């Protein structure tokens, strides 16, 4: 069987370049001569390019599967969101290792119909409303949903237990003796289609639900904005200006927590001396923040890899839906007042 690395070796380019050329990635900046050389070598070795695959549609013998990745975020939003970009990275790594073609980014409300006609299946990243699910299912038989399970009787899904993971973080703060807790978080969004355009609706955020049920906070100590570093900075400044900071904060994303740390530092306040922090997601930057963050680690790359495996399993004939809930790990660092350790 001809592999991408065989073509790369003969063409004297990287495997990633070969994959993107054969996947007809128009955003790839490469000389026309190099592009044609890769295509010629692939055909010479008998590798099925996307163009060949299209011609063979409808024939009995099928080529390698072509997978689409549909994101509920815009390209700019996804680039700025380490959580979702890490899920995509896991998808791309698994596809690369299994030498499976994936399409360029498809975004809800902006995809072209002809792209869906070429796909064998799609992995959807993010929460989508029933109307958007119908739009997808009307065009594709096989879909796997990451971070959302819109129809457990029909579709595979991968996610985590947000409430349980949040309670573990909150209980950790209580176990350390903190009594007055505050919350900084964003608004959980569900994406849908209206007149062909992607729109977002605010829905219940399980992290906030867990916090309100567990901590019984003062209303002024619950600060809600958008999930971004800038908003974390703004909301912590607001908390500082109100006076009487809580003894500790549960912050619903590492990005927001990094912004919050900057606001505290500018105000001459120290973490955890003046207020402690536990955050959520476990992005790489959390370890290298000005005060290393105690955080709930979500295995986002593994979510992406699992999505590919489930979709391939479906394409190979499995009919019953499967739902995977991945575990999380509490990574304890200095921001909560402890020494570093992991708590599963």
Swiss-Prot record:
It is found in: Cytoplasm. One of its GO terms (cellular component) is cytoplasm. Transmembrane segments: none annotated. It comes from the Bacteria. One of its GO terms (biological process) is regulation of DNA-templated transcription. The keyword DNA-binding applies. Disulfide bonds: none annotated. GO terms for molecular function: DNA-binding transcription factor activity; transcription cis-regulatory region binding. SMART domains: HTH_LACI. Pfam families: LacI, Peripla_BP_3. InterPro entries: HTH_LacI, LacI/GalR-like_sensor, Lambda_DNA-bd_dom_sf, Peripla_BP_I. Induction: Negatively autoregulated. Induced by melibiose and raffinose. Residues 2-58 form the HTH lacI-type domain. Keywords: Cytoplasm, DNA-binding, Repressor, Transcription, Transcription regulation. Represses the melibiose operon melREDCA in the absence of melibiose or raffinose. Binds to two binding sites at the promoter region of the operon. This is HTH-type transcriptional repressor MelR.
């Amino acid at each position: 069987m001809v592999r991408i690395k065989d073509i790369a070796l003969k063409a004297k380019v990287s495997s990633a370049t070969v994959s993107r050329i054969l996947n007809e990635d128009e955003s790839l900046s490469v000389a026309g001569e190099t592009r044609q050389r890769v295509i010629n070598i692939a055909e010479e070795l008998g590798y099925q390019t996307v163009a060949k695959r299209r011609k063979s549609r409808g024939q009995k013998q099928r080529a390698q599967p072509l997978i689409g990745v549909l994101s509920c975020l815009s390209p700019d939003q996804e680039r700025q969101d380490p959580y979702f970009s890490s899920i995509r990275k896991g998808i791309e790594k698994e596809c690369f290792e299994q030498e499976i073609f994936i399409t360029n980014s498809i975004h809800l409300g902006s995809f072209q119909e002809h792209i869906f006609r070429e796909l064998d299946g799609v992995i959807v990243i993010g929460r989508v409303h029933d109307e958007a699910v119908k739009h997808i299912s009307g065009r594709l038989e096989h879909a796997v949903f990451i971070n959302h399970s819109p129809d457990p009787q029909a579709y595979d899904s991968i996610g985590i237990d947000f409430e349980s993971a949040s309670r573990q973080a909150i209980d950790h703060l209580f176990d350390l003796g903190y009594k007055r807790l505050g919350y900084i978080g964003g608004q959980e969004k569900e994406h849908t289609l209206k007149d062909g355009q992607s729109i977002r609706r605010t829905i219940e955020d399980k992290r906030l639900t867990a916090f309100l049920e567990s901590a019984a906070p003062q209303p002024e100590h619950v600060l809600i904005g958008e999930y971004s570093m800038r908003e974390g900075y703004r909301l912590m400044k607001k908390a500082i200006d109100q006076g009487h900071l809580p003894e500790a904060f549960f912050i619903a994303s590492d990005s927001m927590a990094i912004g919050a740390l900057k606001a505290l530092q500018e105000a001459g306040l120290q973490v955890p001396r003046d207020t402690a922090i536990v955050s959520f997601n476990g992005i790489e930057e959390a370890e290298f923040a000005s005060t290393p963050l105690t955080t709930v680690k979500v295995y986002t790359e593994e979510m992406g890899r699992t999505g590919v495996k489930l979709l391939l399993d479906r394409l190979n004939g499995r009919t019953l839906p499967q739902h995977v809930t991945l575990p999380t790990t509490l990574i304890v660092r200095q921001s909560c007042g402890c020494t570093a350790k992991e708590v599963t």
